[in-house]
From Swiss-Prot:
InterPro entries: P-loop_NTPase, Rap1, Small_GTP-bd, Small_GTPase, Small_GTPase_Ras-type
Protein name according to UniProt: Ras-related protein Rap-1b
Catalytic reactions of this protein: GTP + H2O = GDP + phosphate + H(+)
MF terms in GO: G protein activity; GDP binding; GTP binding; GTPase activity; protein-containing complex binding
GO biological process, one term: establishment of localization in cell
Signal peptide region: none
Chain residues in the propeptide: 182-184
Amino acid sequence: MREYKLVVLGSGGVGKSALTVQFVQGIFVEKYDPTIEDSYRKQVEVDAQQCMLEILDTAGTEQFTAMRDLYMKNGQGFALVYSITAQSTFNDLQDLREQILRVKDTDDVPMILVGNKCDLEDERVVGKEQGQNLARQWSNCAFLESSAKSKINVNEIFYDLVRQINRKTPVPGKARKKSSCQLL
């Protein structure tokens, strides 16, 4: 079974842990408890393929930024999360993306831009178009709006990253099955 190392990044309070826990355990975490680092594992089926996802839920606070290079070096796919209710969290993502590209030393990194808390439409300050435009600027990066509370697009975030990783590095063994050996 193929393993995938996914990393959830973004400012403090955007809902990184809420999205991760909702995906892994099906629970909405109501209380905000700043994360230092949590790792979760979940087996899922994506496109008829069994996958083991290792999801690293990272700290959003500035005091743990030294650990980020290590997450970025080891991660295969990245969810960059902002809150649609806080413009500053959206603005912070440009630097995070640049750091990922610098650490990975390539522009071709599986990544998805996530506007979280879309259930709080009354409090929205970051328009959906802003997210779509930024994703386009980022070499047509994938983009979704989500809500951990309302279970909107939660699974899709992680499945999309798996699909991007599969496109970038096809599943070992699949290519071999296509070729055949003929003995005469």
